[in-house]
Amino acid sequence: MTYPERPLLHLLTRTSLVVQIIVGLVAGLLLASFFPAAALKVGFIGKVFVSALKAVAPVLVFVLVMASIANHKQGQQTHIRPILLLYLVGTFSAAVVAVIASFAFPSSLVLASQPGEMSPPGGIAEVLQALLLSVVDNPVNALISANFIGILAWAIGLGIAFRHASDSTRNLLSELSGGVSLIVKVVIRFAPLGIFGLVASTFAESGVEALKGYAHLLVVLLGCMLFVAFVVNPLIVFLKIRRNPYPLVLTCLRESGMTAFFTRSSAANIPVNLQLCERLGLHEDTYSVSIPLGATINMAGAAITITVLTLAAVHTLGIDVDVPTAILLSVVASVCACGASGVAGGSLLLIPLACSLFGIPSEVAMQVVAVGFIIAILQDSAETALNSSTDVLFTAAACQAEERKASAA
């Protein structure tokens, strides 16, 4: 009796998630075009998917950050400091580019609901006051109410405290982190069904206008990533090595960025990057540390995604943003981006943290995350390509700068 089901199961497990999401997206569009009444009913599937994301996100951020800080190994710094600085400068610069682009070309999203109870902040002073109150929130309440800033504060604090714990305790935290990550991966496997429901109901209600909104959003996102890859990063590298950066930039994009675009995983691209560093003749003790580290904290693409989608939500809801608050968002996006590598679904699940700066409720923020999943086919690939290629680029720039200093001495 179960035999006929096996080919379908086999097909689902063998087909990549990207292909399944494309199928879900196309199926949702077709259903909305030809059977709008039925499309509205399957919107329930999308709601279930968003609710699952909403449920798992606070626990994920808390456990992941706490475990990563607790298990961080001290020592072995040699040439890592200048590379770390480049990683931080690159990520912050990407967030600033995204802020400028979002102000120049504001994007609007089609959201299912826009609650009237929102109280947007009046300026930087109010934002900082709310930020401080969020930081000192009760940890249990922070998890229940999805207060991501409070969750982050407690996770960092406990992570630092657990660094002095026994090996067995730190191993337990690692295993707990692995368990939560596995649950997230299971939720993400249902993304094609969730996207199908979301796309079908969204286009049945809003029609082609929603598609135009996503197209504009994609252009802004990909435009920012291309600008960072071909203008900002080369400028940073030029200031470091004092010669034409483009041969190195193009090599990194071709050798590392292309594979990362299709694997959509910075971690999976680490062996490719290590091999490229070896071919470039870089210092092995340096790149063996900086490349895995970069796959964790060097997240220019994630900073762009978090910033652009957050400001798209802000613009959609009619919230005014002053310049100091935008700068604060750049900092928050950079910090959030550093934690994006450990999250299945990348930077998207960290958007609620940035949205909370502007008083945007969790349910609206998770709708923005759902929009992110709809455009993730291109966004996630481009984001990973930028992140991973920049790991090699900045490592090579720092190594070449050190060699230049040594030869000049």
Swiss-Prot record:
Domain of life of the organism encoding this protein: Bacteria
InterPro entries found in the cross-reference section: Na-dicarboxylate_symporter (IPR001991), Na:dicarbo_symporter_sf (IPR036458), Ser_Thr_transp_SstT (IPR023025)
Transmembrane segments: 17-37, 49-69, 83-103, 142-162, 180-200, 218-238, 299-319, 331-351, 357-377
Pfam family, one: SDF
Function as written in the Swiss-Prot or TrEMBL entry: Involved in the import of serine and threonine into the cell, with the concomitant import of sodium (symport system).
GO MF entries: neutral L-amino acid:sodium symporter activity
Gene3D superfamilies per record: Sodium:dicarboxylate symporter (1.10.3860.10)
Localization (cell): Cell inner membrane
Keywords of the record: Amino-acid transport, Cell inner membrane, Cell membrane, Membrane, Symport, Transmembrane, Transmembrane helix, Transport
Gene Ontology terms: cellular component: plasma membrane
Annotated catalysed reactions: L-serine(in) + Na(+)(in) = L-serine(out) + Na(+)(out); L-threonine(in) + Na(+)(in) = L-threonine(out) + Na(+)(out)
UniProt entry tagged with the keyword Iron: no
Bilayer topology annotation: Multi-pass membrane protein
Biological process according to GO: serine transport; threonine transport
NCBIfam families: PRK13628.1 (NF010151)
First-listed, main subcellular location of the protein, grouped into a coarse class: membrane
Lineage of source species: Bacteria, Pseudomonadati, Pseudomonadota, Gammaproteobacteria, Pseudomonadales
PANTHER family, alphabetized: PROTON/GLUTAMATE-ASPARTATE SYMPORTER, SERINE_THREONINE TRANSPORTER SSTT
Family to which this protein belongs: Belongs to the dicarboxylate/amino acid:cation symporter (DAACS) (TC 2.A.23) family.
The name this protein goes by in its record: Serine/threonine transporter SstT
Gene: sstT
The keyword Cell inner membrane appears for this protein: yes
